[in-house]
């Protein structure tokens, strides 16, 4: 079997295609969440705290010296990324919770058939007795 044919079979398997679609949708979802946090959530939060722009929170470890740029820790950007992560994690949690709920409904056991009635039990016993009598003859 040629490598191209093997690769085609591998790539067209359902799980691989599903994974690729998931990665693409996940990347797009990440951009939406980043915009939500940076453009919708953080500005009002900064306003409530006192007109603070979280992106500007930073600590300068060393000032710029000539051609050497300053060494700065931008912890405000880190705070925004934490918000991004929390929102994405919560969205994934809710999606998995929904999928698990749907799977549980599919896996519900079939209804147990009712116990045979007295007549059915009696008829079964009569049938078995007749079989025994026929086997003796």
Swiss-Prot record:
It is found in: Cell inner membrane. The chain crosses the membrane at residues 10-30, 76-96. Gene3D superfamilies: Large-conductance mechanosensitive channel, MscL, domain 1. One of its GO terms (molecular function) is mechanosensitive monoatomic ion channel activity. It is a multi-pass membrane protein. One of its GO terms (cellular component) is plasma membrane. Keywords: Cell inner membrane, Cell membrane, Ion channel, Ion transport, Membrane, Transmembrane, Transmembrane helix, Transport. Signal peptide: none annotated. Pfam families: MscL. Its main location: membrane. It comes from the Bacteria. Coiled coil: none annotated. Channel that opens in response to stretch forces in the membrane lipid bilayer. May participate in the regulation of osmotic pressure changes within the cell. NCBIfam families: mscL, PRK00567.1-1, PRK00567.1-4. PANTHER family: LARGE-CONDUCTANCE MECHANOSENSITIVE CHANNEL (PTHR30266:SF2), MECHANOSENSITIVE CHANNEL MSCL (PTHR30266). Belongs to the MscL family. Homopentamer. This is Large-conductance mechanosensitive channel. It comes from Enterobacter sp. (strain 638). The gene is mscL.
């Amino acid at each position: 079997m040629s490598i191209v044919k093997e690769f085609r079979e591998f790539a067209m398997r359902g799980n691989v295609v599903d994974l690729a679609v998931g990665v693409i949708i996940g990347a797009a979802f990440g951009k939406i969440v980043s915009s939500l946090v940076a453009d919708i959530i953080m500005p009002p939060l900064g306003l409530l705290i006192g007109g603070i722009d979280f992106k500007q929170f930073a600590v300068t470890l060393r000032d710029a010296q000539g051609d050497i740029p300053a060494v700065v820790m931008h912890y405000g950007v880190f705070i925004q990324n934490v918000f991004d992560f929390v929102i994405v994690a919560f969205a994934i949690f809710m999606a998995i919770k929904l999928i698990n709920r749907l799977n549980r409904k599919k896996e519900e056991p079939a209804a147990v058939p009712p116990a045979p009635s007295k007549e059915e039990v009696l008829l079964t016993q009569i049938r078995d007795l007749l079989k025994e009598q026929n086997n003796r003859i």
